[in-house]
Structure formats: structure tokens, C-alpha cells
């Protein structure tokens, strides 16, 4: 029966705004929300905490299977992520965590270990899933698919403003370099490379406001 539950996938590179758009769309539709990136980041945190050697595939896969990840919504609507019962939300948002998550996500055995866990989020009345391979690998039969993109320079600017607003001092050039490096890893990896599904709606958000992107995505589902 899970196959009958409607799914909207929103894929795209790092820093493109998938999470922001997906959360708004899920709330408007009244559907569940899967942040697949948070799941990979949670495993990355567990790997770091356990000092697992990233070259030890067997240990990484065991960590992916064993790590307990829970998403808890606070009264203010903010989502907190618990890794093995410890609130790791702030750690998940660190740039170093993102880099480690991208590294382990390139390992086929790790992706296989997390595939079923992601598919279990498919529940009535529907699911909005954001990530990099939601429409191509995890939910290839999804009724609605979006591939969101933006120029690397624009994504770096957005991330720079986010971090500065939080009081985190960063160099714009370093952020841009990191985004380009992550794009290269995601696109060139042999397993589930970042690419739009053949039947995905392509949206370039470089010169768009969030509400404009949300409107296009909602139109895909409701029209």
C-alpha cells in the first residue's frame, strides 16, 4: 500500500535551498517531510563521535545500520535531530559535518544501508523528500519530481549570509571552493551520482525568491 502514497521529490546540489522549499511545501500540503541530507549528516556525526576510520567500509556500514536517528519537532516548529539520543542539531549544521557526510555518501554500501530507512518515511497522506537521489534511486516511482539548481556563486552567497547571521565568521571564497568541490564529488561518484531524473521539473532558482520556487513546486502537485 505504501506504493500508493504520493511522493514529491526535490533533488539538487548543496546550498540550493531544497530544505527551505521542501519544508514549506510539505507544510502547505500537510504531508510528511524527509530530509535525507540530515540522515547522512547524522551518520557522519556518529562516525566522528566513534572515531571510525572513513577508509574502513565495514565499520562505516555498521555505523549506518546501528546509529539511532530521531527527528523531534519543537514547540516553535524547529526540527531537532537526535543521534543516539543526543541532540546533535547544531553539530549537523557544521561545515565539517557536511564534508564528512558527502565523503561517506559516496560509498555504495553506506547508501544501501540507508536506502530502506529513507523509504520508510513514505506514509499517508504523502511525502516530500529532499536530497540528491530521491527521484532517481530512493523513490524512482514518485509521482512528482523536481530538480532544483542555482549557480555556485549564488549558493555560496546564500550560505555566507546564513552563517554571518549566526555570528559564524567565514570567507566567501572558501565557501565557494567548498561548494564546487562538493558538487564535483556528488556528480562524479560512481553510485547514485547527482543528476536530475528524466521526468523531473527543472527549476533554476538563481534569480528567484523562495516563494516563487514554492509556487512552481506546488503548481506541479495541485494543478
Swiss-Prot record:
One of the record's GO cellular component terms: cytoplasm
One annotated GO biological process: pyrimidine nucleotide metabolic process
Subcellular location field: Cytoplasm
UniProt KW keywords: ATP-binding, Cytoplasm, Kinase, Nucleotide-binding, Transferase
GO molecular function: ATP binding; CMP kinase activity; dCMP kinase activity
Protein known as: Cytidylate kinase
Keyword Transport in annotation: no
Uppermost EC category: transferase
Gene name per UniProt: cmk
Primary localization class, coarse: cytoplasm
Assigned EC number: 2.7.4.25
Amino acid at each position: 500500500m505504501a506504493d500508493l502514497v504520493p511522493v514529491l521529490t526535490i533533488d539538487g546540489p548543496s546550498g540550493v535551498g531544497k530544505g527551505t522549499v521542501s519544508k514549506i511545501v510539505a507544510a502547505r500540503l500537510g504531508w510528511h517531510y524527509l530530509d535525507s541530507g540530515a540522515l547522512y549528516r547524522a551518520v557522519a556525526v556518529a562516525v566522528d563521535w566513534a572515531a571510525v576510520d572513513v577508509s574502513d567500509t565495514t565499520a562505516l556500514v555498521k555505523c549506518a545500520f546501528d546509529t539511532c536517528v530521531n527527528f523531534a519537532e519543537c514547540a516553535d516548529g524547529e526540527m531537532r535531530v537526535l543521534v543516539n539520543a543526543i541532540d546533535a542539531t547544531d553539530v549537523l549544521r557544521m561545515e565539517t559535518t557536511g564534508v564528512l557526510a558527502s565523503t561517506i555518501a559516496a560509498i555504495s554500501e553506506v547508501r544501501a544501508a540507508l536506502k530502506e530507512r529513507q523509504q520508510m518515511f513514505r506514509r499517508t497522506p504523502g511525502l516530500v523528500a529532499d536530497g540528491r537521489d530521491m527521484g532517481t534511486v530512493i523513490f524512482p516511482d514518485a509521482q512528482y519530481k523536481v530538480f532544483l539548481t542555482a549557480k555556485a556563486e549564488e549558493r555560496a552567497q546564500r550560505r555566507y549570509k546564513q552563517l554571518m547571521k549566526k555570528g559564524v565568521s567565514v570567507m566567501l571564497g572558501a565557501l565557494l571552493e567548498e561548494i564546487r568541490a562538493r558538487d564535483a564529488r556528488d556528480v562524479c561518484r560512481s553510485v547514485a551520482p547527482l543528476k536530475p531524473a528524466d521526468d523531473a521539473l527543472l527549476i533554476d532558482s538563481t534569480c528567484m525568491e523562495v516563494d516563487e520556487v514554492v509556487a512552481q513546486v506546488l503548481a506541479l502537485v495541485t494543478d
